[in-house]
């Protein structure tokens, strides 16, 4: 078993583009006033993969599904997907990452790496 990283550091300009496409602060941080953990290098979006095949393991939803099926409740998904998501959560927490309750794929580590308040100006 291994990991596939979808997203880590994200420039503010990319955050602004995401916000423009999906302006919901529960799932996408505002590029100026939000927490912007990806812009600060304190967040990672990832999943589990089978190292032999390279295939992604079954998870509660696809990546960036912005609805309640993506949360960490897991009662509304396939039991295998729930078990895989719990494995990912357990491993990430073991290494100091905190899960975000609304997205099974999103983890932060703001304790080990203090947040840098300097940002590039948003584009557009």
What are these regions (language model features)?
Residues 1-124:
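Cell-envelope/glycan interface and biosynthesis
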């Amino acid at each position: 078993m291994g990991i596939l990283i979808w997203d880590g550091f994200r420039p503010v300009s990319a955050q602004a583009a995401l916000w423009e496409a999906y302006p919901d602060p529960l799932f996408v941080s505002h590029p100026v006033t939000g927490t912007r953990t990806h812009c600060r290098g304190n967040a990672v979006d990832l999943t589990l993969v089978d190292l032999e095949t390279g295939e992604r393991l079954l998870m509660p939803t696809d990546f960036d599904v912005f609805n309640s099926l993506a949360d960490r409740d897991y009662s509304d998904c396939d039991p295998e997907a729930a078990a895989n998501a719990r494995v990912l959560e357990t491993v990430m927490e073991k290494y100091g990452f905190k899960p975000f309750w609304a997205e099974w794929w999103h983890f932060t580590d703001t304790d080990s790496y203090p947040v840098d308040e300097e940002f590039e100006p948003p584009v557009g």
